[in-house]
Regions:
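NAD-dependent ADP-ribosyltransferases
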Residues: 1-261
């Protein structure tokens, strides 16, 4: 199991009191989020990237007995658009790594006024990973496109009906990578995700799976002022049931995570 420094603070927000109650009683839930990879939004830049892999595509199609210049324009466009740009829905749990003294206002207004500060050990136990951010048409996003396009090209095959198809196993491997990568230029956030099985190629999909969460796993609980007493009572009951000697502190949603209580 990986080690995540215990000094790091991880925030998970939700918009409703009932959702927080469910998390405290039944664990945190994996929900579907769309993940997407496109190296650039600019058509001309995308064309340059496609041109770099066309020789490999042409060689692969020729080897399959389907030369590129014999395909109709509709099929060519489908092949080119599917080479290195992908999207899909993946079950996951999202958390934000919060540096000391960082304002929580954006998180509260964007994601909800009920929140948990979860200990690093819990994230490590459940396989959480920090998201890698790459810039639009940056060297990293270009290389990711090249890798994905190459895998897609090498996985091309001809169906019994003569159609050219992408390989599901190759596609699944790439889709499983996408939850850990985001293409964007805004780099102020540090997001972590616990990613569940999507079941694209067989197997059970883990949407709505709950990850056990004990009082010992939580450092703070943030709620609106009028909910502090209610959740303090809930936490004390759960802590007693679980034998937790130091239950998490319930606070009115602060402007930043307290350094200590």
């Amino acid at each position: 199991m990986r080690t995540i420094p215990a000094s790091l603070k991880f925030l998970h927000c939700t918009s409703q009191a009932d959702f927080l109650t469910m998390a405290l009683n039944s664990g945190l839930m994996l929900t579907d989020h769309e993940v997407r990879f496109a190296p650039t939004q600019d058509g001309a830049e995308f064309g340059v990237l496609v041109d770099r892999v066309v020789p490999l595509l042409a060689a692969r199609l020729a080897g399959l007995g389907k030369p590129l210049d014999t395909l109709d324009e509709t099929r060519k466009r489908a092949l080119f658009s599917g080479l290195g740009s992908m999207c899909g829905k993946i079950p996951m749990l999202c958390l934000s790594e919060i540096p000391p003294d960082k304002s929580l206002d954006h998180h509260r207004f964007s994601f909800g006024s009920f929140a948990l500060v979860i200990r690093a050990e819990w994230l490590a136990c459940h396989g959480a990973e920090r998201i890698v951010y790459v810039g639009l048409n940056s060297p990293a996003s270009q290389q990711l496109y090249n890798c994905m396009a190459t895998m897609h090209i090498l996985g091309l095959h001809v169906s019994p009906t003569g159609d050219i198809l992408f390989d599901n196993v190759t596609t699944n491997a790439m889709l499983e990578l996408l939850p850990y990568v985001e293409v964007r230029d805004h780099l102020e956030e540090a997001e972590w995700r616990v990613v569940g099985r999507a079941g694209f190629v067989g197997g059970a999909r883990e949407t709505s799976k709950r990850l056990p969460l004990k009082m010992d796993d939580i450092e703070y609980i943030f709620v609106p002022n009028d909910a502090v007493a209610k959740f303090t009572s809930q936490v004390l009951v759960l802590a007693n049931q679980q034998g937790c000697s130091t239950p998490p502190t319930v606070l009115q949603f602060p402007s930043c995570i307290p350094a200590a209580i």
